[in-house]
């Protein structure tokens, strides 16, 4: 008993008693009317659809957005040849400005800001230097979570800010799962306990996690016997006492990011990838007592054609994640850095290590971290590391990081489990944009990045540049809402509507239903794995991908062993702004994340499909192959 009531454990015991004492007040969640309506999508209509009493066009609505060339044409009309004298002498400068907001950065946060602002009635343009989700947002652990380890930090180290972060993330977890049900799912995660002390500690911690989200749309945590745990996870070493199972969410991060960009475009925003901001446009208006020119727009360069556009706007938001300081330095060369960068390495293993519907958490690795082992797209995703990192483009995992992850799995594995680098199908490194009041020098190993807060930071410069940075995937929507609120208040922008993104379905989510894959099998004669993949990747747009596949005979697989088909390449170019083969293997499909070697095999076929659509010459095709192979090098360790 003394051990259980040790000093380090007392906060958890007290908190656990509190949870048990007041859990009766949590009650059942009264689902809001919107969610009720979404979950009861015309059962009769779905039955009629499945029985072919109505056509797909009576139920599904194809997403309509401007193509990239159409968006550039519209941008050209908006673009003004910047003349400093004319801008300063204009009696009504607002007449020169057609856009309310420019967003720099096409990751989760940037596309979230663009969608929030455009859906309120603002006129928005978003510019991304590379592809949507090409940076940090595609390289996550794929979890939609409150952050159970941050809860431990909040309680054990008495950090109220961490508790606030957990509560916000738990609320946003539900919003994300509801708005993109095809791209996300609830996922039970098992925490193994090798002592009664650990079992008690983990159980109380998970019950606290439940308490801070006292609604019934996410199942509650529970204790599980060692026998059941061994049955599900036979790789575990002997000595298990029990395990605790808690619930979080999982999503396809890149597909989610692309859906955000498409939804913003459907709302009317200009969402352009491969457009780099090379200059900030300013006038000579003095902001109060600060001798700082006011920001009035940006100059962008189309990286595919080299053409430049000067684009005025009332406000500019910097949402470039770990690269935000470079934009801040464009605005003010004196600006101090605010980013403490951290690298997060993940590896992909074959799918036979854990169940397809349950994850595993190593609660404490040998250096005090946590490690997730998760099912993802038929494989096993393992990660992550958390080390200081230089801020570079296209980071590559280090051999030592891959070995660390493999060793961390072995800590909980029985001797019969053989794991080595030869089984790693792919690996990647993402850079977390952590915000620190006292940023460490990049690569400074004396500062533990795992101790830097995951909260976001929102700030405005003297020129009016608004920077949003930090946070995590799960809280992208609330971060975007806070950003647009600041845009409206600081730049006096009136919007006819308030924020509606809490209940705004993303492209593919509005009319998705759980048996859509069966409809695809029956009506398009698709193999089961391909139908399942299309339903979960495209949601209610999947029938249009399947229809395209049947019409032009592009229902063949891109590579054996995976459900990706040729029609997805055409669809990605025509409907999802894919401009390179890398976009296809990395972000429209997830092939490069699942299997580096198979992605390389698929490249020639993908390039041959894209070439006539994008008018590539033979020389351009060779260049594309080389560029894509260079990208694939970042999906292996060095």
From Swiss-Prot:
It catalyses: a quinone + sn-glycerol 3-phosphate = dihydroxyacetone phosphate + a quinol. FAD binds at residues 100-128. Pathway: Polyol metabolism; glycerol degradation via glycerol kinase pathway; glycerone phosphate from sn-glycerol 3-phosphate (anaerobic route): step 1/1. Its EC number is 1.1.5.3. Its cofactor is FAD. InterPro entries: DAO_C, DAO_C_sf, FAD-dep_OxRdtase, FAD/NAD-bd_sf, G3P_DH_FAD-dep. GO terms for molecular function: glycerol-3-phosphate dehydrogenase (quinone) activity. It is an enzyme of class 1 (oxidoreductase). GO terms for cellular component: mitochondrion. This is Probable glycerol-3-phosphate dehydrogenase, mitochondrial.
């Amino acid at each position: 008993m003394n051990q259980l009531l040790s000093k380090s454990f007392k906060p958890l015991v007290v908190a656990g008693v509190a949870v048990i004492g007041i859990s009766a007040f949590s009650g059942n969640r009264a689902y809001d009317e919107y969610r009720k309506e979404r979950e009861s999508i015309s059962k009769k209509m779905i039955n009629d659809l499945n029985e072919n009493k109505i056509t797909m066009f009576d139920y599904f609505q194809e997403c309509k957005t401007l193509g990239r060339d159409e968006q550039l044409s519209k941008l050209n009309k908006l673009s003004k040849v910047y003349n400093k004298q004319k801008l300063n002498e204009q009696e009504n400068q607002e007449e020169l400005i057609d856009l309310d907001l420019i967003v720099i950065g096409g990751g989760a946060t940037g596309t979230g800001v663009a969608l929030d602002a455009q859906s309120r009635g603002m006129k928005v343009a978003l510019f991304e230097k590379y592809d949507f989700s090409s940076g940090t947002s595609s390289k996550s652990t794929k979890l939609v979570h409150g952050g159970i380890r941050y809860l431990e930090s909040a309680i054990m180290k008495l950090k109220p800010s961490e508790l606030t972060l957990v509560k916000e993330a738990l609320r946003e977890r539900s919003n994300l799962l509801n708005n993109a049900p095809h791209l996300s799912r609830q996922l039970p995660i098992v925490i193994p306990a090798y002592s009664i002390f650990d079992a008690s500690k983990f159980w109380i911690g998970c019950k606290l996690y439940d308490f801070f989200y006292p609604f019934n749309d996410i199942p509650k945590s529970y204790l599980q016997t060692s026998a059941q745990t061994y049955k599900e996870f036979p790789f575990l070493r002997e000595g298990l006492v029990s395990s605790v199972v808690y619930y979080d969410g999982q999503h396809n991060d890149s597909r989610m990011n692309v859906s955000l960009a498409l939804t913003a475009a459907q709302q009317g925003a200009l969402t352009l990838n491969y457009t780099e901001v090379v200059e900030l446009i300013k006038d000579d208006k003095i902001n109060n007592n600060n001798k700082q020119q006011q920001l009035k727009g940006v100059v962008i360069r189309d990286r595919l054609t080299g053409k430049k556009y000067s684009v005025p706007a009332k406000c500019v938001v910097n949402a470039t994640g770990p690269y935000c300081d470079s934009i801040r330095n464009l605005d003010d060369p004196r600006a101090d850095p605010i980013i403490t960068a951290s690298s997060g390495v993940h590896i992909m293993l074959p799918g036979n290590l854990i169940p397809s519907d349950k994850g595993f958490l190593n609660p404490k690795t040998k250096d005090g971290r946590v490690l997730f082992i998760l099912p993802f797209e038929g494989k096993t995703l393992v990660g992550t590391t958390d080390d200081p990192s230089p801020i570079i483009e296209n980071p590559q995992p280090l051999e030592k990081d891959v070995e660390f992850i493999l060793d961390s799995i072995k800590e909980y594995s029985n001797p019969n489990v053989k794991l080595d680098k030869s089984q790693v199908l792919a690996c990647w490194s993402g850079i977390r944009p952590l915000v620190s009041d006292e940023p460490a020098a990049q690569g400074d190993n004396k500062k533990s990045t795992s101790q830097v807060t995951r909260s976001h930071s929102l700030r405005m410069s003297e020129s009016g540049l608004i920077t949003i940075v930090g946070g995590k995937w799960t809280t992208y929507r609330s971060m975007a809402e806070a950003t647009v609120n600041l845009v409206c208040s600081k730049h006096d922008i009136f919007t006819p509507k308030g924020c509606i993104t809490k209940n705004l379905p993303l492209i593919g989510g509005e009319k998705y239903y759980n048996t859509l894959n069966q409809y695809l099998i029956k009506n398009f004669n698709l193999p089961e794995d391909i139908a399942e993949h299309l339903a979960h990747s495209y949601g209610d747009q999947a029938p249009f991908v399947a229809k395209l596949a049947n019409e032009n005979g592009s229902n063949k697989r891109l590579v054996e062993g995976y459900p990706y088909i040729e029609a997805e390449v055409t669809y990605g170019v025509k409907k999802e702004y894919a401009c390179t083969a890398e976009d296809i293997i990395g972000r429209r499909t997830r092939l490069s994340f699942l299997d580096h070697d198979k992605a390389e095999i698929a490249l020639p076929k993908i390039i041959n499909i894209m070439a006539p659509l994008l008018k590539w010459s033979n020389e351009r095709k060779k260049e594309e192959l080389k560029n894509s192979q260079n990208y694939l090098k970042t999906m292996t360790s060095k």
